C-alpha cells in the first residue's frame, strides 16, 4: 500500500481535487493533506531567496509530525517518479539514518577555483568535514526512529532560527547526519536544468531514470 501525505498550507480545494484524482482506480493508494502552519508557529524561517518558502523546512520536522510512522520517503513536489517508489522505500540503509543522492551541483560549486566562498561556507560555517559527500535534500529516505533518537526538535529549532543557511533543510540534514548517511543511486534524483543546458543534460542522462527533478528559478511550493 502507498500512503502519500502532502504537507501544505495553501493548496486550494480545486487543486486538492486534482491531486486526489491521481489515485482513481487504484485501491492500494491513499492521498491525504496535512495542514502544517499550526505546527510551525514557534519557528522563524530564514529564506535566502524569493524562490524558496517555509515549506522548504518541513522535511526536518516530518518525523515529529508523524509520530506513528517509523520510516518514510520525503520528496519535493517538483519531482516526477518514473518507477515504483517502493523500490526506494526498501533500500537498505544499514546502520545509517538517511539516504540521498550525492549533490553534484554542489560539487561544482565546491570546485570553483575563482570563488572559494562555497567551500568556506560548508567547511567553516557549517563545520562539515567532507562537503563532497553532501546529499541533495530534494528526495531522501529517512529512518524516523533513529532520527528522533539523535536529533531533538530543539536542536532543529536552533538551526532554523539562528543560522542563515543557503540550502536550508538540506544543509541542516547534512550537518546533523554527517557520517550517518548513505549515498544512493544517482537515478533516484536526476536533475533537469530547464535552461540552455537542457539538451546537453538530456544527451548525457542515464538511459534509465527513476526520478526527475525540475530545478527552476521559481519553485512550485
Where would I find each of the regions flagged by the language model?
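A structural signal for isolated positions on well-ordered beta-strands in alpha/beta enzyme cores
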Residues: 3-5, 32, 73, 182
